[in-house]
């Protein structure tokens, strides 16, 4: 993100060559420190423990995720359970939440690329305007989410960008829509992927355009759903700790869920 942190507790020691474009602000430096510290503590008690613990450091989250390569590497090991942790600003500092059930949302990207035929703005009749097509797609897709998702379920669809031409009197050849949707029910998430893809194709056909870069069912990041048994162990172990708390589930996505797909 093109911003700089303004709430550092100490003077910055490490500086990027492009500091104005390197802020992510999800606290991943904290995640790295937490995992390293946990590994150091566990290693100091290795003579008292059984089994093998693998520490996993993901190189990205949501976009540019490192989970696919990590899962491929972990396939050679017999993984019994996955533990992931994410800092969250909505919780009080010094608290920990280990509730069972859905905790963080599944997600998929929406980025249909509409192709038309450009021309001069004075003669739209001689062009196939992908901007009009993309704008109508936004309305169609947003409306469909309120009508086609199962009652009682929620799929949050956030459209964030519509990129077409760069001047006011030239109709572009292409126009691209960007966005994301989040869900806690995997089947509803798959339904949403199929829905926005179908709407993109039908809207493109209606305006004489073509469309590609539709979302793929295989690229969906599933929701993070804590196993009741594992979460129960953690809650029981920490029942005497005053910093255990309960928190609302988050619509932010976490690739920890991808790791959970490889466990019993």
Model segments located where?
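Histidine/acidic-residue-rich, glycine-tolerant segments that coordinate divalent metal ions
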Residues: 2-23, 29-30, 42, 47-172
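Metal-dependent amide/peptide-bond hydrolase catalytic core
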Residues: 132-264
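Hydrophobic transmembrane-helix microenvironments that flank and shape a buried ionizable site
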Residues: 25-26, 258
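DPxDG-like acidic metal-binding loop motif
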Residues: 32-39
């Amino acid at each position: 993100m093109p911003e700089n942190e303004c709430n550092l507790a100490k003077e910055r020691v490490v500086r990027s060559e492009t500091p104005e474009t390197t802020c992510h602000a999800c606290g991943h430096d904290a995640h790295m420190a937490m995992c390293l510290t946990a590994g150091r503590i566990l290693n100091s008690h290795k003579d008292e423990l059984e089994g093998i613990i693998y520490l996993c450091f993901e190189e990205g989250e949501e976009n540019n995720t490192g989970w696919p390569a990590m899962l491929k590497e972990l396939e050679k090991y017999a993984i019994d359970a996955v533990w992931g942790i994410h800092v969250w600003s909505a919780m009080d500092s010094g608290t920990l939440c280990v509730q069972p059930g859905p905790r963080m949302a599944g997600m998929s990207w929406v980025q249909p690329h509409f192709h038309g035929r450009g021309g001069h703005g004075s003669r739209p009749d001689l062009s196939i305007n992908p901007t009009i097509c993309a704008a109508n797609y936004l309305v169609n897709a947003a409306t469909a989410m309120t009508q086609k998702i199962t009652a009682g379920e929620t799929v949050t669809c956030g459209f964030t960008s519509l990129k077409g031409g760069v001047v006011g009197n030239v109709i572009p050849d292409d126009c691209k829509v960007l966005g994301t949707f989040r869900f806690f029910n995997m089947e509803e998430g798959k339904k949403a992927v199929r829905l926005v893809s179908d709407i993109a194709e039908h809207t493109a056909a209606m305006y004489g355009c073509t469309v590609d870069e539709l979302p793929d069912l295989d690229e969906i990041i599933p929701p993070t759903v804590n196993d009741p048994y594992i979460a129960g162990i953690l809650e029981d172990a920490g029942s005497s700790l005053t910093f255990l708390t309960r928190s609302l589930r988050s619509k932010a996505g976490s690739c920890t869920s991808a790791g959970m797909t490889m466990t019993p």
